[in-house]
Amino acid sequence: MIIVIITVMVSFLCGSIPTGYLITKKLSGIDVRTKGSGNIGSTNVKRVAGTKISMITQVMDILKGIIPVLLCMLIASKIKLPISTSMYLSIIVIAVILGHDYTPFLGFNGGKGVNTTVGAFFLLAPAAVLAGAVVYFVLRLFTKIVSIKSIAVGITMPIACIALRLPIEITVCAIIACGLLILRHKDNLIRLVNNEEK
């Protein structure tokens, strides 16, 4: 059980690395928290520091999700765990996302979790990620509003998990991740309702 606790904590800390803030500060000298929406995610980084820095942030946020899950998959293949592998990896995924969304390094105010969620599920439920990506790119044909596409990805992934009959632990994990993503987009949802979102 000790290995589970340690890897969950390390995964949370990995997710907590405020990549958008650090990269933007290093490459442009801008504190992304003081510009645009104030969010450290790649969408706001693009707004305040340009496409190149935003793309670097996006890649790093995705890797932040992939790497802990990959390492924990390797651990699960070598060590007998007190819980199922699906349960273990699902807990790791939620830890990474929570770390990103509520990073202790920035007063528990992190990003909105889209890229890190996609990265975390990339190895755990690749078909669900693919379904989310398809929905995202289809919606690009109809809207430029990033929050609509992001929320749609979050909703699509648990639906895909259910449709694909993935293990219940992974499906529940996807539902929780979707809930966190929607929660982090609550201000965007309010603006959408008021027709103020851009």
Swiss-Prot record:
It comes from Clostridium acetobutylicum (strain ATCC 824 / DSM 792 / JCM 1419 / IAM 19013 / LMG 5710 / NBRC 13948 / NRRL B-527 / VKM B-1787 / 2291 / W). The keyword ATP-binding does not apply. Probably interacts with PlsX. It is found in: Cell membrane. It catalyses: an acyl phosphate + sn-glycerol 3-phosphate = a 1-acyl-sn-glycero-3-phosphate + phosphate. The keyword Zinc-finger does not apply. Belongs to the PlsY family. The gene is plsY. The chain crosses the membrane at residues 2-22, 55-75, 88-108, 118-138, 162-182. Catalyzes the transfer of an acyl group from acyl-phosphate (acyl-PO(4)) to glycerol-3-phosphate (G3P) to form lysophosphatidic acid (LPA). This enzyme utilizes acyl-phosphate as fatty acyl donor, but not acyl-CoA or acyl-ACP. Pathway: Lipid metabolism; phospholipid metabolism. GO terms for cellular component: plasma membrane. GO terms for biological process: phospholipid biosynthetic process. Its EC number is 2.3.1.275. This is Glycerol-3-phosphate acyltransferase. It is an enzyme of class 2 (transferase). GO terms for molecular function: acyl-phosphate glycerol-3-phosphate acyltransferase activity. The lineage of its organism: Bacteria, Bacillati, Bacillota, Clostridia, Eubacteriales. Its main location: membrane. It is a multi-pass membrane protein. Keywords: Cell membrane, Lipid biosynthesis, Lipid metabolism, Membrane, Phospholipid biosynthesis, Phospholipid metabolism, Transferase, Transmembrane, Transmembrane helix.
